[in-house]
Amino acid sequence: MENIMTLPKIKHVRAWFIGGATAEKGAGGGDYHDQGGNHWIDDHIATPMSKYRDYEQSRQSFGINVLGTLIVEVEAENGQTGFAVSTAGEMGCFIVEKHLNRFIEGKCVSDIKLIHDQMLGATMYYSGSGGLVMNTISCVDLALWDLFGKVVGLPVYKLLGGAVRDEIQFYATGARPDLAKEMGFIGGKMPAHWGPHDGDAGIRKDAAMVADMREKCGPDFWLMLDCWMSQDVNYATKLAHACAPFNLKWIEECLPPQQYEGYRELKRNAPAGMMVTSGEHHGTLQSFRTLAETGIDIMQPDVGWCGGLTTLVEIAALAKSRGQLVVPHGSSVYSHHAVITFTNTPFSEFLMTSPDCSTLRPQFDPILLDEPVPVNGRIHKSVLDKPGFGVELNRDCHLKRPYSH
């Protein structure tokens, strides 16, 4: 009988943060909203807070960047480490070091599903179905997958069963789809700038933006509109129809996450041929099952927020059983290793984090080292052929560890 590899146990889990409310803005990293001045991502973009004039001009004005980046590292008893980043900051550090550590340390590095289930169960009474706690659990889960891959010497996508395609093709999210086209992306997703409080004038302005970009990009380049939970059903329906003449491919996250009936109605009333998408701010498999039942066309979980890679794999299987697509929200290498194994993810998202969208900057810069970016809008699977997620932690980022155990 052949020898079976003996896997080590997890000896330590540690949590750091960078950025957040007490830091100078512009730390970047896992909290990619934390950018410096004159950045498109902090421009006049429609949000649930836009109806308040004091908070409509900038997303940082209402505190979108107060959490900062959470970094979780797990260390095996043989000294190997895995890590991941997400958006949870100092509060996420507390949850990891003071609560979740008991479910991690002492377990085998392969006990990812067991640890995941225990973290979900133990936090259920204070986590709800998403938000800060789910971001933290996601970060731990991703760190565990990174460690497991490094211990066995395989990239995460091979742990999931291997690639189903040779490369990932991307659309770009940012303010300049025309520049994205020049870089080889298959499409560009723009932020909506106006909402229900702006009335029909807001609809006309955003439709005019789409029309202008259609003229610049030509008839075949995909154009999409990201509404970031800022609308109601009536406004979103009107906006979708106003943009239909310009061949808008989809309209995204128009409504708050829990408005499932609203999504059902929006899908029913959207223009023929225009897709309705959402899921970025949903967490847990159960919430995605409810979202899937609304009939939307694409579910868009963020692997750093939805429950981690373990949950993302479950969401993809759920969507596949219903004939729906899963196109994760951003998330760089943490998504790349997943989507290249999903048959119902024919393309993926690349988030433009350069201030004016004129250059390709890694999404989680500067916290990750060796983070790949698309070349001509694509990443070949060979780029992912490194153990774990294939990136390293930049320890020059002044990591802060506020708690220990």
From Swiss-Prot:
Cross-referenced InterPro entries: Enolase-like_C_sf (IPR036849), Enolase-like_N (IPR029017), Enolase_C-like (IPR029065), L-Rhamnon_dehydrat (IPR023444), Mandel_Rmase/mucon_lact_enz_CS (IPR018110), Mandelate_racemase_C (IPR013342), Mandelate_racemase_N_dom (IPR013341), RHMD-like (IPR046945)
Active site per UniProt: 329
Gene that specifies this protein: rhmD
Listed cofactors: Mg(2+)
Residues that, per the record, bind Mg(2+): 226, 252, 280
Stated name of the protein: L-rhamnonate dehydratase
Record has Metal-binding as a keyword: yes
Enzyme class: lyase
